[in-house]
Amino acid sequence: MSRLLRVYVDGPHGLGKTTAASALASERGDAIYLPEPMSYWSGAGEDDLVARVYTAQHRMDRGEIDAREAAGVVLGAQLTMSTPYVALNGLIAPHIGEEPSPGNATPPDLILIFDRHPIASLLCYPLARYLTRCLPIESVLSLIALIPPTPPGTNLILGTAPAEDHLSRLVARGRPGELPDARMLRAIRYVYALLANTVKYLQSGGSWRADLGSEPPRLPLAPPEIGDPNNPGGHNTLLALIHGAGATRGCAAMTSWTLDLLADRLRSMNMFTVDYSAPPEACVAQMRNLLPSMQCTVTPKPESHRAVADAALAFMREMSNCK
């Protein structure tokens, strides 16, 4: 049996998480870095998936297409973008095992550093597009329902940077297909801040049914920055945002079932934060210093270590040869 550490580095695009995560993996002989499947996203269809989403938003804003047509494009793109993550998650799930007993500080034999978790394409970015009026809440609920169960030892690193610095970084990187959209950036920062609040709320024993279920829906307050130590109430979470949006569309039962599923998926995640306003090497150091606090798992079978490593390497290989 071996020890496996899984680290999911996630957050709004343009923060510098990819630079830090890949640098952390490259300095360790026991780590595999799994990048965003950009080659898959650019080869799965007639055009780049990222460009497809931004173009749909831009054309809808200009009145060239209506909201229904834009939603169809965005829903299809988000679903396709989630496929590599969800498929890999299902492949390695039988080999993850359980967390060791408390106090056992044996270091991991293998570290997987993922550039994003499935919730990015099935929860966070769809909700941001809902806020920019490019995706109806019914479509968001459909995607949330596809979020896979959270295995033991799921470590999620979120992070933030000042809004003005974030926008300038996004403009400077000039990723193909990506448009510098300040409104979308505000929306995705808002969603990830609410995500951090949601995990804290659930892990403190919060129940959306008790705190939100009997009250009129309302939009969450402006959330604090990710990493705020205060414990948020239920009204300042993704659960409140989705609860309010679903209730206004007359789909209360479906919304409730989906919120139960989402709470189950998020409650057991081990969440950490990085301050990306620091220089790149300092961001790497922050991630490095977080590793000893993370939860690993003990693989259930002798062959599990090799199966997980082979799957990770195949992910990297296939994602770069899918056009």
UniProtKB/Swiss-Prot annotation:
E.C. numbers: 2.7.1.21
Disulfide bonds: none
A Gene Ontology BP annotation from the UniProt entry: DNA biosynthetic process
InterPro entries according to UniProt: Herpes_TK (IPR001889), P-loop_NTPase (IPR027417)
Positions with a binding annotation for ATP: 11-18, 169
Stated role: Catalyzes the transfer of the gamma-phospho group of ATP to thymidine to generate dTMP in the salvage pathway of pyrimidine synthesis. The dTMP serves as a substrate for DNA polymerase during viral DNA replication. Allows the virus to be reactivated and to grow in non-proliferative cells lacking a high concentration of phosphorylated nucleic acid precursors.
Identification of the protein by name: Thymidine kinase
Species: Bovine herpesvirus 2 (strain BHM-1) (BoHV-2)
